[in-house]
């Protein structure tokens, strides 16, 4: 299902991709630099003092809210898709952080149609520690939540400039843009993901940097990363991550 959706999107962009050369690739990298420069931020409380991109969407008194999220999704061949991840809303006005850990499973309903079953577990962050705010049904899940680390805490993109020959797409009408790179299993970030997750394939991933909004900067729109290990009709394994700065009144709606 996810595979077919992405194929449709890529086909619709084929006409727009042509003509995107090294200049556009450089522009996309520069657009992502401010976000990727935050990797790694080991202490999440450092976000209370980090400034983000501000425009007319922000109230002058609003210091803004950072949203960080990381999710691993695995769909083994012949089995259902399962996603496990966490989102935090780091409010710079109140210097408080809350969010949720979630588990989403794709299953069949009584009529054989695919449906998503998602369970959320509310959390808060204090002294760089994740704390569940409601009782957790089992100790294993509780430890999984308490020990969770966001990719922004350990990822590192200091060698982004060395990524070459990316598959570049740009649609000025949306606007949206992306750059995709084939990585090796020796890549630092790939090693870090394999260290933290049980990834059931030796296949090296592709890194996709994707965003929407003005390439020159805007608080409207979003940027995200995706490490895709396997993507086809029968099997999907990918890790997604994002860091976004938003007006506080809109960040938790």
Swiss-Prot record:
Its main location: membrane. Belongs to the staphylococcal tandem lipoprotein family. It comes from Staphylococcus epidermidis (strain ATCC 35984 / DSM 28319 / BCRC 17069 / CCUG 31568 / BM 3577 / RP62A). It is found in: Cell membrane. This is Uncharacterized lipoprotein SERP2443. InterPro entries: Csa, Csa_sf. Residues 1-19 form the signal peptide. A lipid is attached at residue 20 (N-palmitoyl cysteine).
